[in-house]
Structure formats: C-alpha cells, structure tokens
C-alpha cells in the first residue's frame, strides 16, 4: 500500500513499497486521465519521456488496459529527445515505439516526434512549429493563462542530479521563457545534442507526473519536495521548478527514492 500525502506547494506524493506497486498505480492513473480527457474534449494528449518510465508503463499493453484505453484518441509527444536517428538505441522515440506504441492501436499520424535528419536547433524549431500547428487546429489545448500548450498529461522521469526532461541543473535552458522547445548541444549526459520542452510548457500542463526510483534519487527527491531553508541549492534544481500553474502535480516513487523525505522518515 502506497504512503500518500499532499504537500501544500509540491503536489501529491505517492511512496510505493516496490516497483510493481508503482507500475500498477501509474498505469491506473494514466488510464484514468486518458478517459477523463477524452470525455472532456475528445482526445488525450500525452507527453512521454525516456529512461525507465516507459518500462513502468508496460502494463498498458496488458489486459484490461489494452482493451479499455481508447488508443485511437491518443496523441503522443515527447518532453525531450536525443538528436539521433529514430532507430538509434539512444532515441526516446525508439524506446517508446519498441516497448509501447507498436503494441497498441495509436494512429501513426497521432505520434509527433522530431525530425532526426537536421541539427538540434532545427529539430527544436520544427518540433515547436508542429505543436503550434496542433494548438491552432485545437488538437492540443491552449493554456488559458500563458502562451503555451496545455497538454493533458506530461510524464517526467528524474535524474539523480534532479534533472527532468533535458533540463539540467544550472543550464541556460532553464531560463528559456519565450520558446516552447529549446535545444542543447552540451547535455550533461550523453548524447550531447537534445531538444527539450521548456519549463513554461511543462508548467502549463493539466497534469504532470514525476517518476523517481532507487536510492540514488533520494537526495534529489528531498531537495525537490521538502521545505528547506533559503537560500538553498534546490532553487536551481529543475525538479523543484516543476510547478504547474493551473494543474496537478503527482510524484510517484519507491521507498528507496523517498527515503530522505521528511514525512517518510517520520512515518517510518
């Protein structure tokens, strides 16, 4: 049974006993938001990330989800992407396609991925243009209080350094406000060339999920969620800057990742 509570500023926190429990809860949540979004406006615009997140979504291709999810209404995007060929092992697109999208009935034309034949800067520009066209056609909702799209659900992993998408600590990309998509040629993790959603886009979503597992994430989770004295290095921690302006934020983690949280230590 997950230990769950709501922080006044940092959203809902769900600390799970193990990865199996986390995966079941995450997939239940995705299916629930999918159904609600389709009921509300006829589509579900979901944003994926790379890493272990896709493996935690694996139960979506199993009963009952494979039959009850309305895959034809899904529109799929990526919060960040490595600027490599789509068949390259580093590609977030390939990871999602091989392990999820090729096994369900999402229409190929509903999958919005980057152009992998151009530079990182061009890929970011083209990706933003494609999303702007989808906002203009009302496939993707527009935010009521910012010049940003309002995705139904953005799924983020988190690194041990507190990075989300390809927004790394102390990187200039954190300061980009006017673009929806920006690019990096000096990523702190290889490969160096990437595109990423900017913080205004992430924080304009209706629902944002951050998934973190393992002891190596515990300190970053503590800095991202707990109340800390100021000034503090956590202020430049990308995960702490995830703060939907008019949406929901939920943290899914296992006990190891949550082990340094003040509330979790007290409950133990």
Swiss-Prot record:
GO MF term set: 6-phosphogluconolactonase activity
Subcellular location: Cytoplasm, Cytosol
Gene Ontology terms describing biological process: carbohydrate metabolic process; pentose-phosphate shunt
Keywords: Cytoplasm, Hydrolase
InterPro entries hit by this protein: 6-phosphogluconolactonase_DevB, Glc/Gal-6P_isomerase, NagB/RpiA_transferase-like, PGLS
EC number of the protein: 3.1.1.31
Disulfide topology: none
Species name: Arabidopsis thaliana
Family stated for the protein in its record: Belongs to the glucosamine/galactosamine-6-phosphate isomerase family. 6-phosphogluconolactonase subfamily.
Entry protein name: Probable 6-phosphogluconolactonase 1
Reaction equations catalysed: 6-phospho-D-glucono-1,5-lactone + H2O = 6-phospho-D-gluconate + H(+)
Primary location group: cytoplasm
Function: Catalyzes the hydrolysis of 6-phosphogluconolactone to 6-phosphogluconate.
GO CC aspect terms: cytosol
Enzyme class: hydrolase
Listed pathway(s): Carbohydrate degradation; pentose phosphate pathway; D-ribulose 5-phosphate from D-glucose 6-phosphate (oxidative stage): step 2/3
Null allele phenotype: No visible phenotype under normal growth conditions.
